[in-house]
């Protein structure tokens, strides 16, 4: 494994009840043509995406992004692994959605990767003609759903995945990334 890139779209419930109430309140205010006063997120979250989910350091990285990099390196026992992580605040109540790109040192086999993930406990791969969603599939489930497993357009060593989970039932974004551990160790 040479590189991991993760873009995680986090729901407002990642901020607890306050986040859920904030999205509901902002949505009602906007739909009733009332002025909006952001409280929890510092900006409008209703019908909007925010480019960060928490405070950023001097280099512009959020705490959650740095934690994901550190924990994934430790989990994989690859302390020098190049990892890029971006966390986005999405205007959804529940369910995490991740775009994950993995680059290995040799050509990837998307079908073998898909089969390996599908065999992993707590992971369900949705066939290539469909894809899972956080609301339609993952909500209320303890399963991590993986879809759109495919090799990169320009680089046959690259594999791209779409991963969704119920953040309340299954845990944080790191748990979704951990589901790819078998794939990384066995096939990249």
Question: What is the predicted function of each stretch?
Answer:
Residues 80-188:
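C-terminal active-site/capping subdomain that shapes the small-molecule cofactor and substrate pocket
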Residues 1-115:
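Active-site-lining helix/loop region of Rossmann-like oxidoreductase modules
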């Amino acid at each position: 494994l040479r590189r991991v890139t993760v873009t995680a779209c986090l729901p407002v419930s990642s901020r607890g009840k306050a986040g859920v109430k904030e999205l509901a309140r902002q949505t009602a205010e906007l739909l009733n043509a009332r002025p909006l006063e952001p409280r929890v997120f510092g900006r409008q979250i209703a019908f909007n995406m925010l480019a960060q989910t928490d405070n950023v350091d001097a280099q512009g990285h959020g705490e959650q992004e740095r934690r994901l990099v550190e924990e994934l390196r430790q989990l994989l026992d690859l302390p020098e692994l190049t990892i890029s992580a971006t966390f986005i605040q999405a205007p959804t109540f529940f369910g995490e959605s991740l775009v994950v790109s993995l680059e290995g040192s040799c050509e990837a086999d998307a079908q073998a990767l898909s089969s390996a993930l599908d065999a992993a406990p707590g992971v369900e791969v949705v066939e290539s003609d469909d894809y899972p969603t956080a609301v339609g599939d993952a909500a209320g489930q303890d399963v991590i759903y993986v879809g759109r497993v495919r090799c990169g357009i320009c680089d046959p060593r690259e594999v791209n995945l779409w991963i969704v989970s119920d953040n309340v039932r299954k845990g944080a974004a790191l748990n979704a990334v951990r589901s790819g551990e078998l794939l990384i160790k066995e096939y990249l």
